[in-house]
Amino acid sequence: MEIGIRLHDTAGSNLEEHLRNAKEQGFSCVHIAMSKVVPGFKMADAPELLTDALADEARGLLEKYNQRCVLLGCYLNLCSPDLSAHERTLMNYRAHLRFGKKIGALMVGTETGAPNIGYKSCPECRTEESLRLFIERVKPVVRWAEEEGMMLAIE
């Protein structure tokens, strides 16, 4: 059995320090949220930041510290009523799926979202209408995951 950890729950100020500490604590696999372990990484800019060079660096560090990325986090609101933000969110998921494959991640993780701009839990989150909206909005992400040979984990 392998025991993993959310990488941002380890001490460190950059990806390498977090990975080193995960290894020293006895973990062999990690959940990576880039914005929490890479200084200056902003999720809003992920499509531009998740480059081949960064993937090579991350994959090299994972290998150096004998870690496996089980899950690459991309917890953005797929149910936002802001359609311009939704288009950017879709680009972000696609970038995470591509990047995840390049670093050897098993899956990209997400949540079902909230039908509001603030991404806040509310009674409407638990309605049939919200579920239908999520299912419709996640379809292209699932298709891209299949194209990349990745899994999409939904919390």
Regions found by a protein language model. Give the residues of each.
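N-terminal amphipathic alpha-helix/helix-capping segment at the start of soluble metabolic enzymes
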Residues: 1-3, 62-63
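Hydrophobic faces of well-ordered beta-strands that scaffold small-molecule active sites
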Residues: 2-7, 30-32, 69-74, 108-110, ...
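Short polar catalytic/cofactor-binding loops
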Residues: 7-15
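Residues that cap or flank secondary-structure elements
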Residues: 9-10, 50, 88, 133
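Catalytic domains of carbohydrate-active enzymes, especially glycoside hydrolases
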Residues: 15-38, 103-107
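Active-site acidic/histidine proton-transfer and metal-coordination neighborhood
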Residues: 16-18, 56-65, 78-155
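Glycine-rich, proline-tolerant flexible connector loops at the mouths of alpha/beta enzymes
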Residues: 31-57, 112-120
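Glycine-/proline-rich flexible loop or hinge segments
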Residues: 39-45, 73-81
